[in-house]
C-alpha cells in the first residue's frame, strides 16, 4: 500500500525537518519511504513543503501526485499547496496559523499548544504526534526514535511533551502542559528585589555626598 503525505508551511516552522523525521520513522519501522522538499529563497518566512511517500513495496515514483494526507501550517501554504487534492484527501490545518476557510479540514491548535509548552518551534513535533496517532502512518515507537535522533541535545523533555500533546489532541483530550519551575521564578524575583535595594542604596549615598559637599561650602564661607 502506498501513502502520500504533504506537509506545508513557511520557513522557520520546521517543515522540512518534520518530513525527514516522518520518512526516517517509516524506514525504522521496516517500510519503504522517500522524502522530497522544496522551499523559497528566504531562510525564514518563505513557502516550504515536504512530501513523503510511504509504501510496503519499493517506491517507483518519488513524487506526491495527489496527497492522501495534507497538513498545512500557514494560510499562504494552503493557497499554494492545497490545490491538487483528491476526494479522499484528509486535510489538517493549524487553527491559529491558517485563518482562511478550508472546507472539510480538521482545525488543530498546533502552534497554540506549542506556545503553552513554552516554545512555538515545537509546533511541528506537536503536529507529528497528532498525525502519528490520527492516521496510523508509522508506529509510535518508530516515530519517537526518529525524533530523538534528530532534535538538539537538551531539548528531549520539551519534544517529548510536544509529541505527547499532539497525540492527546488526536484522542480528543486536552494536552497536559507541565508547570513552569517555581524555583526559577523565585530566583528571578529575588534578583529583582536585590537590584531594587542596590538602586536605593546608591540614591542614599548620592544624597549623603551632596550634604557633605554643602557642609564644606558653608565652612568655606565662614573663613
Which stretches of residues belong to each language-model region?
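Active-site cofactor/cluster-binding pocket
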Residues: 1-193, 197-205, 211-223
Amino acid at each position: 500500500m502506498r501513502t502520500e503525505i504533504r506537509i506545508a508551511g513557511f520557513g522557520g516552522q520546521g517543515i522540512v525537518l518534520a518530513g525527514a523525521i516522518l520518512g526516517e520513522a517509516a524506514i525504522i519501522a521496516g517500510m519503504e519511504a522517500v522524502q522530497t522538499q522544496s522551499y523559497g529563497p528566504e531562510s525564514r518566512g518563505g513557502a516550504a513543503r515536504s512530501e513523503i511517500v510511504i509504501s510496503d513495496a519499493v517506491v517507483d515514483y518519488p513524487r506526491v501526485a495527489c496527497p492522501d494526507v495534507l497538513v498545512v501550517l500557514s494560510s499562504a501554504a494552503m493557497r499554494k499547496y492545497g490545490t491538487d487534492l483528491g476526494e479522499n484527501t484528509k486535510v489538517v490545518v493549524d487553527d491559529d496559523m491558517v485563518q482562511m476557510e478550508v472546507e472539510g479540514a480538521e482545525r488543530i491548535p498546533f502552534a497554540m499548544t506549542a506556545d503553552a509548552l513554552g516554545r512555538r518551534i515545537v509546533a511541528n513535533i506537536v503536529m507529528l504526534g497528532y498525525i502519528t496517532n490520527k492516521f496510523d502512518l508509522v508506529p509510535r515507537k518508530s516515530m519517537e526514535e526518529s525524533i530523538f535522533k534528530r532534535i538538539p541535545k537538551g531539548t528531549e523533555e520539551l519534544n517529548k511533551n510536544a509529541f505527547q500533546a499532539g497525540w492527546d489532541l488526536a484522542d480528543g483530550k486536552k494536552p497536559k502542559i507541565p508547570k513552569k519551575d517555581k524555583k526559577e521564578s523565585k530566583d528571578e524575583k529575588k534578583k529583582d528585589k536585590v537590584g531594587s535595594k542596590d538602586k536605593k542604596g546608591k540614591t542614599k549615598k548620592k544624597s549623603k555626598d551632596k550634604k557633605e559637599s554643602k557642609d564644606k561650602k558653608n565652612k568655606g564661607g565662614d573663613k
